């Protein structure tokens, strides 16, 4: 086996396989996290902006199972999937939720969102976009939660995506950014994917 194939995790690829094919053929640890998460809890705050319009729409349109928990008190989604159920209290969340929380809030609210996720029984947390503030990451670790990722959008690691996200994901794969390992250090240079 060639040196190149050994470096690709013993992948059995034709020597002339284009780089884009090689990039897409390899799986990423974050793919496993999001694709096997079950019904994760998406924590956001509608008083801070567009949440849950964009996120709710993206996850709903791809058939992903999730429960949306809004710290801002909004009980129905807005945007492309208006009217979908949004929870405002942890005690109202269905029992079949998984142990993964995706945090999509501004940094000033992130530590509170982590506490709410922990109250919901979540043991793992994924900070989407700019939500991975150092204080929130420290709070998650203090509560014994596993920090899965700081900065990247989980939609990029789903099997199915809405067209705009699919195009963005292809660009990330071609650029090499998709393959970077999960970021769990809040002090590292940020690799946010917007």
Where are these regions (language model features)?
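Glycine-rich adenosine-cofactor-binding loop
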Residues: 38-52
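A charged, well-structured terminal subsegment
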Residues: 157-194
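Short acidic, glycine/proline-enriched helix-loop-strand junctions
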Residues: 96, 134-157
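Glycine-rich, highly charged phosphate/nucleotide-binding loops
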Residues: 79-95, 102-111
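Short, positively charged and aromatic/hydrophobic N-terminal segments
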Residues: 21-23
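ADP-ribose/adenylate-binding Rossmann-like module
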Residues: 120-139
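NAD(P)-binding Rossmann-fold cofactor-contacting core
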Residues: 57-79
